[in-house]
Amino acid sequence: MKAYWVCVYEKIDNAEKLKEYAVKAKPAIEKFSGKFLVRGGKNRTNDGIDSPRNVVVEFPDYNTAVECYDSKEYQEAHNILKGHVVRHHQIVEGG
């Protein structure tokens, strides 16, 4: 069963760091067969916090999604964001 990273950004303090993260994260995600379904774009908040950016990445299965997040390659990219964004990142299994 496929799995997804669902990332809801609450606050972005440094757009340049976000770009740097994206450049480094993309090959790490692709290494684990991750496919971007949503990256930014127009959105409407119906409930909860207004989000300046949303990202959804599809993986072949839950374990692969977890392995990617925990990988050295992705964590190196993730560290670029520390102190520059507030986001909610979940790994969910779905159909």
Write out the residue ranges for each language-model feature.
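Short S/T/G/P-rich N-terminal loop/turn motif that feeds into the first structured element of a domain
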Residues: 1-53, 60-70, 93-95
